[in-house]
Amino acid sequence: RARDNKAFAKTLEALAAAGPRHFYDAMAKDFAGYVAGETPQDGRMVEADVTSYAAKLRDPVCGRYRTYKVCGMGPPSSGGVAVAQMLGQLERFDLAALGPYSATFWHLFLESQRIAYADRELYMGDEDFIPVPVAGLVDPAYVAKRSQLISPDKALTQATPGTPEGVKVALAPGDRPNENGTTHFTVVDKDGNAISYTSTIEGAFGSGLFFEGFYLNNELTDFSLTPQRDGKPVANRVEGRKRPRSSMAPTIVFDEAGDVVLVVGAAGGPTIPVQTARAIIGVVDFGLTAQEAIGLPLIMAFGPTVVYEKGSVIEGFEDTLKELGHTRIRSFGASLKANALRRVTAADGTISWEVARDPRIEPKLSYE
């Protein structure tokens, strides 16, 4: 909190007075010098590394799910594409009839994850350095074709990347960095303007470097440590001035009239797109409140390995999931951080917003 962190309060005051240029003008030299002094290796940060950086406005990734338009974050984040692919692959199934207390639903959800993440590992990265076939990856025809790989009766032996329209470079899949240290919040103001915001410093306390009241990130670890395989480049390999791939999936859902009906997102590294898609399915297909949807258990496919939330309803489905082919399955203690706002329209037309936070965490959210 700024009141307990005098250096941070001073930084916020400077930003309020000078705007974001404060980072690039007044702070740049001291910032670079501090980082360089704490970095004994070659390739130390210099002032030009700070002053040459520019935040970029990027196009959202949007797709249709049932009667809704779902928009999320594009590359270098993989979240928007992954959410769109998972939802699109599941659209041919009657999820409403299955419900959240069905082993079949969780099996189908796992399969959609595997297929979406296979594409993610191969294609997703910084578009300034590698052509990412975003339009092809979320094209309804491509997603429908990928959906045909999903069987309600049997798990895939192995999920492999597809070949969407627009592929220009032969790539190789990289390794999967471990991501955490992320924050997400959602806001809707009195005029209906909505923000779904995800930010991260990667690891817990980032790099551990503390400057002017805030921690600095260690996002370098979000790159693939393998630059190439079999002579083919990895999309998320390390390169100078490149932005690493992330899993962030801030999402806004619109109805057919173009009105915002759900604002959602999460923290939690590679589980973020899964948490987000799960919440959307909960509201759209299962008719749950946002709080109930956010509270649904987590199940995640890390390649052939499946982990699910310990003590959840999924625990009772473990044997069934094994019979379906998910043989490498185990429980874990979930520490999830999703939240959402859902529009609620009363009979008299009055609009309010339901506030939802993950029940597995302590902080309270409010609607005023």
Which residues are covered by each model-predicted region?
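Non-catalytic, conformational "gating/processing" segments within enzyme and secreted inhibitor domains
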Residues: 1-40, 120, 127, 154-160
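Short, small/polar residue-rich loop motifs at catalytic or cofactor-binding pockets
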Residues: 57, 179-182, 246-248
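Internal maturation/activation junctions in enzymes
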Residues: 5, 43, 92-200, 331-332
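Active-site rim segments in enzyme catalytic domains, especially the processed small/beta chain
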Residues: 38-46, 188, 193-257, 262, ...
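Structured, charged N-terminal subsegments at the starts of enzyme catalytic cores
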Residues: 33, 37-111
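Alpha-helical support elements that line or immediately flank enzyme active sites
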Residues: 17-24, 29-35, 88-91, 266-288
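Short, well-structured alpha-helical segments that form the helix of a local strand-helix-strand
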Residues: 26-32, 101-117, 290-300
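Extended C-terminal subregions enriched in glycine
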Residues: 191, 241-244, 276, 285-333
